[in-house]
Amino acid sequence: MLCIRPEALVLLGALLTVPLDPVGGQDALSLTWEVQRYDGWFNNLRQHEHGAAGSPLRRLVPANYADGVYQALGEPLLPNPRQLSHTTMRGPAGLRSIRNRTVLGVFFGYHVLSDLVSIEKPGCPAEFLNIHIPPGDPVFDPHKSGDVVLPFQRSRWDPNTGQSPSNPRDLTNEVTGWLDGSAIYGSSHSWSDELRSFSGGQLASGPDPAFPRQAQDPLFMWTPPDPATGQRGPQGLYAFGAEQGNREPFLQALGLLWFRYHNLCAQKLAREHPLWGDEELFQHARKRVIATYQSITMYEWLPSFLQQTPPNYTEYRPFLDPSISPEFLAASEQFFSTMVPPGVYMRNASCHFQMVLNESYGSFPALRVCNSYWIRENPNLNSAEAVNQLLLGMASQISELEDWIVVEDLRDYWPGPGKFSRTDYVASSIQRGRDMGLPSYTQALQALGLNTPKNWSDFNPNVDPQVLEATAALYNQDLSRLELFSGGLLESYGDPGPLFSTIVLDQFVRLRDGDRYWFENTKNGLFSKEEIAEIRSTTLRDVLVAVTNVSSSALQPNVFIWNEDSPCPQPQQLTTEDLPHCVPLTVIQYFEGSGPGFGITIVALCCLPLMSLLISGVVAYFRSRERKKLQKRGKESVKKEADKDGVSAMEWPGPKERSYPVSIQLLPDRHLQVLDRHLSVLRTIQLRPRHRVNLILSNNLGRRTLLLKIPKEYDLVLLFNSEDERGAFVQHLQGFCASCALGLDIDEMGESELFRKAVTKQQRGRILEIFFRHLFAQVLDIDQADAGALPLDSSQKVREALTCELSRAEFAESLGLKPQDMFVESMFSLADKDGNGYLSFREFLDVLVVFMKGSPEDKSRLMFTMYDLDGNGFLSKDEFFTMIRSFIEISNNCLSKAQLTEVVESMFREAGFQDKQELTWEDFHFMLRDHDSELRHTQLCVKGGGGGVGVIFKPDISSRVSFIIRTPEERSSPQGVRLPASEASELGGPVLKKRFGKKAVVPPPRLYTEALQEKKQRGFLAQKLQQYKRFVENYRRHIVCVAIFSAICAGLFVERAYYYAFVSPPSGIAETTFVGIILSRGTAASVSFMFSYILLTMCRNLITFLRETFLNHYVPFDAAVDFHRWIAMAALVLAILHSVGHVVNVYIFSVSPLSLLACVFPSVFVNDGSKLPQKFYWWFFQTIPGMTGVLLLVVLAIMYVFASPYFRRRSFRGFWLTHHFYILLYVLLIIHGSFALIQLPRFHIFFLVPALIYVGDKLVSLSRKKVEISVVKAELLPSGVTHLQFQRPQGFEYKSGQWVRIACLGLGTNEYHPFTLTSAPHEDTLSLHIRAVGPWTTRLREIYSHPMGDGYARYPKLYLDGPFGEGHQEWHKFEVSVLVGGGIGVTPFASILKDLVFKSSLGSQMLCKKIYFIWVTRTQRQFEWLADIIREVEENDHRDLVSVHIYITQLAEKFDLRTTMLYICERHFQKVLNRSLFTGLRSITHFGRPPFEPFFNSLQEVHPQVRKIGVFSCGPPGMTKNVEKTCQLINRQDQTHFVHHYENF
């Protein structure tokens, strides 16, 4: 073991204590002694830490804790502290000290205690021994509520103690345990430096040199509020070496005394030694002041206090432990409390006792103690002379009697803790004793070898028997329970009792003899014997005389004792009656006044998403307006041209409907046309010669309204901008009527009456509904009650309308066709027998009867008559050609004249009429001989026709077209639509491979029907179980990954929550805000993990690479974007919970006292006694975590709202820009946690690895996407589709179905948009088909509409990033795959189909044996470019791998006469050219929406050996949801398993 000689330790102590920056050589030579440290270290060379600041108290008697370790004793074993104080220590003031001890001696004792010990600092984590106030307490519970609790926080303890009964808790002494002037100079070098002026060796003074400067940071003086006035802050408090040196003016006066004495000594030394520098002067003055302080305390004050002379000093005893004991603290402090008077006199040197001013109550003979605690800028002590008068007054005033009574100024009006302005000093002292684990009174006597009383009667006979009896009753007559504090006071009378005297004397002797720096120790080199004798002869009177400049005769020789011959006797012993009343208790409500602001702040934070939504709405509005401007740009010239011949106005459609702009055109053929703002014809009104035009004008409200009455139709109501515009139109109309020989009647009425008189379209619609209801009631023999009764109304306009004749437009609308269609014109002309341009009820009924009840011959004759345009009884080839052309109009198709001629010739040739130029009705009916059943079921489908009209149409098995029609039963059935026979035949057995023109060798099988009949019906629970099993099977990889990720997040949450709830380092935060800290810290860990690893879901290059590895069998990399959204939403929920947790925290922290917050946040708060916590807005807006948290909520609100699907569809650029806020998000997240308010930063633990991977992935993309790529070809296709063909970069490898991100240099280099490649991997160039649906794609179409140069320079270049993978790449992993594309969502399948056929032509081995491609489009012309690709696939598909079904949804979904004829023509066209009349393809063409459930059901029967079928859909959300729902429905059955992948556009 290494041994160190004492001399070496002395040298080490000298090196550590002597300043290293002397002013000069003379200075260095002048400090010939070892300078004493400020923190108490090395005062004892054997035990360096003895007496050091922060060292524990050392017990004289073993601890007395309830558990033997740290838990304090309390009720019911010991009495209530307040009850004990009120019962035992209560008594009248004004009892004079028996020994004539002065008040100066009492407060000098308090000053000595502040130099020796300080345990007022609360411990951490906060522990409370609250004092419960008995109900009805006159001071603290005058209203008898019974729920008043005075908070008492336990003191700071040594963390190395309190572990076991052999090592019980010991409190920590915050100051040095030596009598070394720490109350004057501070207990640390830094504290002393703050007190010094560093000039002339003096302590720093304020504007008045007699006063030190005021307390300020970083000098943490104790600054509680004034309990009398509530004044707060350091203003008016002085900087002393003792933290609580400003507690009372009396203690403050003693601090000022020693401050001035030090500066006096420094000034004297400076005069004597002019060459000394500041450090020498300061250290010499400090040395002399400390020695004088030690001498006065030990040899003048202590004997007067104990009435005992301490033993003579012999030598320094290094083996003696001088540490302060808790018993000494209790004995001395509590004995002083009995001597404190209710007031303190002030006098001058001539013995004149001053009247003191009380701002509230006037003048009084003395300062009231209870109203002087922590007083700021006392008007009675605003000068050095006033302080001198207070010191002289204390020297002349005799203290209270040394007994058990404590004045009410301490007992009831001591400065209170927390939100209480007052507390009970005695009760708090009792609790402090229990906190320190003080022994009982009898245990202390026994331990110190003193006589122990046997019973209660053995106490001091001077004790009031009633007090003794009451005390015994509180302790249940058990003397062994009597506490040290109570017993010590009860045994004292006039002088401290044996116990207190023994404890105090022992402590001071140990302090003296164990201190190496004691002034009488001649071996330390501090003083010579002459100097020691001089110091011993210096008394406090000498100090007072030197400082106050009063005559020595104005003070008695011993200022701690007043004798009869002493000068300036006090006027009288002060009582409470002579003084102002104590300011009563007040309770501070920390949150008072903060409620509205706190609520508004929370509401504002909750409204952040709404504010973001409002901003997004404004952005979407402007983007929509911009898009409309782009769309209108091409129509402006047309509109201007139309405005030349038309009149602009607003049409009023009816009440509670918005008016809309229209343009009125008057045509020479007596027609009035109403056009919308897109110049589309809304309505055509035919004005007949024998009709008079009725015009009604408004004569009020601006005279700008006009009503045009139209017989047998709804009226036209126009609103003009002004009367002049209306007048111009009326003149124009008058001229038009005159030129067309039309009569015009003009009338005027009020505008409101005009509106009531008008027959609106809505009213006309109700009349037509009744018209059709009764029409079908007569045709189909429906009961009148079922048809509905005609409404009876006396209104003239309704009676006129009930004559009800249909116009050509209404007739066309009822058939779902256009008025200008040839079919409409032919049918209308045929039915309009009287030729008046309208169909009456009877005329329509005659035609309807033929369709509803007529034979096939009647129907064909009707068709023949309709198209016999010249009425000669023959149908020429030209008329037949016209008929076919009218059929084609239904699909908006435009076949060439040659194609139509070929169709007509083929039909004539098929019927054997190739040599005829005209057909009779018999010939025409013969041509339809194969379609007798179709004609039999043909009806005229009318809107509003009621039930029973539509009948399923079942064409021949070799048909390439089908109609999807719903019967009423099907409309109400859950399965929706039946499978047409064309589909059943297409999917059935060997017929599946038949081409048109070839006859089937077997009858068409009814696979779909038979399969339904054979299916086993399961119960509801069984179906749900099967559906669940299929869901798990489909998404097992997704479920496992989500479960693992969720488990990690949950684990992080639980770990942090458990840590802070139970095993965190003792800071007290869990006890302060248990729910808030668990919620906030648990969610913080999970959110940190989520926001870190969400970056991996956006590492597109890494995902594309990994999906080609074996990991793709376990991780669904194609669901990265969905997983990204899921993480984002989960993180959002947890972020909200995190915010809620912090809202709880902020509220709790805003109502928690500063002492508690200083424990929870030691790096932020310092407990200076000011009590008040920070307001809520400080936490929100003035801290780094709070401010960054609010900013994070703002960023999240913007990012999430702008990332919503709704907004992305309206402004992709807004989404693109706001999503780049993620950089700001991560910066704020890092800053948010870096403040380490509760824990050390942990975000980097989660963030570092994903961030590095993400940055690497972005660098890979950056290296690619900054290469300019030339566009080879640009085509503008119908339906707003732009086809771009561009160079394929070198080394660019991709797979069919993948997508890329492009930026157009002409539109900005930073805005990238994702599009699916429509080129195949084997092609030399890349191609995209981009539909103009937003501003960016619309501008892209504009840019590429006009070439700018020659060659590759003709078009703006592109930046390319990708390729990236999607789930559609897995089509080849299934034996049977179904591809469903809707709208622009067909783009991935264009690449897949081309790739499939290419691989098939090369004879590549593929698992996939059959692909069904379902294309859903409004019209076959919508995406003609895809038709070309399908045509190419059909030409190269020699192995019949692909079966294409095209669903045209815009066709009339009615089985009427014209669609029947259309089907017949389609069939003949297929026979001739083996391709569709509409698309030119061999694909199956359907009119209607795809019936997914029957289609998938039939696939199970067609491919019974296949157990798993892949379904890949891409398109609008509605379509993909239907596919997903169908797959889930079929997966309930224990048959083929349908695995669905989808992507929404």
Curated annotation (Swiss-Prot):
GO cellular component: anchoring junction; apical part of cell; apical plasma membrane; cytosol; endoplasmic reticulum; NADPH oxidase complex; plasma membrane
EC number: 1.11.1.-, 1.6.3.1
Region (Peroxidase-like): 30-596
Locations listed in the record: Apical cell membrane; Cell junction
Induction behaviour: By forskolin and down-regulated by iodide (at protein level). By insulin.
Cell membrane as UniProt keyword: yes
Signal sequence annotation: 1-25
Residue numbers on the Cytoplasmic membrane side: 623-1037, 1098-1125, 1204-1220, 1264-1545
Binding site for Ca(2+) 2: 868, 870, 872, 879
Keywords linked to the UniProt accession: Calcium, Cell junction, Cell membrane, Disulfide bond, FAD, Flavoprotein, Glycoprotein, Hydrogen peroxide, Membrane, Metal-binding, NADP, Oxidoreductase, Peroxidase, Repeat, Signal, Thyroid hormones biosynthesis, Transmembrane, Transmembrane helix
Quaternary organization: Heterodimer with DUOXA2; disulfide-linked. Interacts with TXNDC11, TPO and CYBA.
Full protein name: Dual oxidase 2
Gene: DUOX2
